[in-house]
Every structure is written in structure tokens, then in C-alpha cells.
Swiss-Prot record:
Responsible for synthesis of pseudouridine from uracil-55 in the psi GC loop of transfer RNAs. It comes from the Bacteria. This is tRNA pseudouridine synthase B. The keyword Repeat does not apply. GO terms for molecular function: RNA binding; tRNA pseudouridine(55) synthase activity. The active site is at residue 38. Pfam families: TruB-C_2, TruB_N. Belongs to the pseudouridine synthase TruB family. Type 1 subfamily. NCBIfam families: TruB. It comes from Nostoc sp. (strain PCC 7120 / SAG 25.82 / UTEX 2576).
Length: 293
């Protein structure tokens, strides 16, 4: 078996938990995931199985979330799973005020990741250092947020904001919740998070582990074809002789102006051969997925 699974991760599971479970269910060792999802988050977790694990690096990096920000609360983890640092009612905060602050979180921004995160500093993961009580300065990183759209606003002592966020890889929604609360000096934390899109996969087409197990038992499960997850890349077809040479590591001259990574197919069979890179009209092998003899 090889290809991708659009998994709907359940609450409380780590991304590694899902991979470990799938290895047992599929009886495969080669299982990997794209884009770590926090245990408290649910939603799309792209899974690669078999040789498709080699294609994870080529998946598009865009992501989308539905997030709930709770104002008046600040926690150690920047979500409700951590210890409460401060809790102060802020009933006077209005949606109109919050809306005026949202534009500063859109575009390329400097973001300090949560101290409880998988990012490595000096070779050590931040969450390991945080659990040991070690205080370390976390450097800011440049991330990109494409849009933030308000979905709902609930008033109260601890008002909540529902937003839809589209962003690039490496963006921490927990950090946005924290920093948005800091703007109003109320504190803010992430109360809920659903990933609705990741690396070309959508929540509407996803499978839970229970769904997958049911399909496996019925013998109806088919993974998403490896190349179907890479439709963001343009494609190139090669005749048999050129395809064979390319699969053997040779560069192929093509009269094409396209520059960058492409999907490569054999013209006669439409078999997906792998990923190449076009530079100055030359197709260079990057990853041969299906060699031909």
C-alpha cells in the first residue's frame, strides 16, 4: 500500500500517536505525517504510507484553521491544557475593538512560538525544557498569515472569538491567541482549534480512525494516489526512452520555460515517475518514485 490518508485527528492524540496506531492498523512500518497537530487540536492530519513518505517534503505548506480565542485568561501553554497564569474578567471588551487589532496579525509577521512547542533551541525541544522548568528566551520567527475572518463573538466575563485563519507553515495559532490578548492587556488563550485544511487536504473529505478501521475491515479502503496530493505542482510527460533515462538519474533537455519542481509522468502509460526540477530547459531528477526498466 502506498499513497496518502486524509486523517481527521481526534482530540487528545498526538500526531505520533496517530502514526503509531496506523502502523498497527495497516501493518506497515513506513507511515509518516505532514504538519504536526497539537494534542488538543482536531482536524486534518495528512498521513503518508509506503513510498509516499518520500513525497511529504513536496506537499504544499498552506494550512487553514477554525480557532476559538478566549480573552481574560493566560496559561503556560497558551491553550486550555496549561496552568492558568492570570484570570481576569474583561466583559467590557467589544468585538469592534478586537476587529481593529486583527490586521496587525495578517501578512508576514514576527511571531514568538509558545514555550510548549516542538521547536528546537540549541538542540533541545522547547517543551522538554519547559517541563524541566528551564527558562529560555525563544527567538521570534517570521511566519505568514494570509487571512483572519471573524466567524462569531460571544460576550461574557471571558468573551470568546471564533475566527477562520489561513496561514503558511510554522504559524502557531496559540501564539496568535496569546498575542491578541496582549494587545488589550487582558490575556488571551486558545480555547479550541480545528484544522480545516492542510497540504492540499480538506476536513470535508477526511476520515477518522474509526472510519478508516471500518473501511479496512470491509475491504473498501483505498489511499489517495501519491501524485493526487501534489496537484499544486505542474506536470511533465516523457516518452519511454527519456523516461527510462530520467529514472536512471540522467538529465533530460526539454523545450520548456517552466522553472521549479514538477510531477513527472511516462507519456505512454501515464505512470507517475517522481519529482523533477526544471532549470533552464533541463529536467533534473529530484526523487524517483516509480522507476521503470
Amino acid at each position: 500500500m502506498q499513497g496518502f490518508i486524509n486523517l481527521n485527528k481526534q482530540f487528545g492524540w498526538t500526531s505520533h500517536d496517530c502514526v503509531a496506531r496506523l502502523r498497527k492498523m495497516l501493518r506497515l512500518k513506513r507511515v509518516g505525517h505532514a504538519g504536526t497537530l497539537d494534542p488538543a487540536a482536531t482536524g486534518v492530519l495528512p498521513i503518508a504510507v509506503g513510498k509516499a513518505t518520500r513525497l511529504l517534503q513536496y506537499l504544499p505548506s498552506d494550512k487553514a484553521y477554525k480557532a476559538t480565542v478566549r480573552f481574560g485568561v493566560q496559561t503556560t501553554t497558551d491553550d486550555l491544557q496549561g496552568e492558568i497564569i492570570t484570570s481576569q474578567p474583561c466583559r467590557g471588551l467589544s468585538l469592534s475593538e478586537v476587529k481593529t487589532a486583527l490586521p496587525q496579525f495578517i501578512g508576514k509577521i514576527e511571531q514568538i512560538p509558545p514555550i510548549y512547542s516542538a521547536i528546537q533551541v540549541e538542540g533541545k525541544r522547547l517543551y522538554d525544557l519547559a517541563r524541566k522548568g528551564e527558562i529560555i528566551e525563544v527567538p521570534a520567527r517570521t511566519v505568514e498569515v494570509f487571512s483572519i475572518d471573524v466567524l462569531d463573538w460571544r460576550e461574557g466575563d471571558f468573551p470568546e472569538l471564533d475566527v477562520a485563519i489561513a496561514c503558511g507553515s510554522g504559524t502557531y495559532i496559540r501564539a496568535i491567541a496569546r498575542d491578541l490578548g496582549a494587545v488589550f492587556h487582558t490575556g488571551g488563550t486558545l480555547a479550541a482549534l480545528i484544522r480545516t485544511h492542510s497540504s492540499g487536504f480538506n476536513l470535508t473529505d477526511s476520515l477518522t480512525l474509526t472510519d478508516l478501521e471500518t473501511q479496512l475491515q470491509a475491504g473498501t479502503f483505498e489511499p489517495t494516489p501519491a501524485d493526487a496530493a501534489l496537484q499544486c505542482l505542474p506536470s511533465v510527460t516523457l516518452p519511454s526512452i527519456s523516461a527510462q533515462k530520467w529514472c536512471q538519474g540522467q538529465r533530460i533537455e526539454l523545450n520548456l520555460e517552466t522553472i521549479g519542481k514538477v510531477r513527472v509522468y511516462q507519456a505512454e502509460t501515464n505512470i507517475f515517475l517522481g519529482i523533477g526540477e526544471l532549470q533552464a530547459g533541463v529536467l533534473i531528477p529530484q526523487m524517483v518514485f516509480e522507476p521503470i526498466s
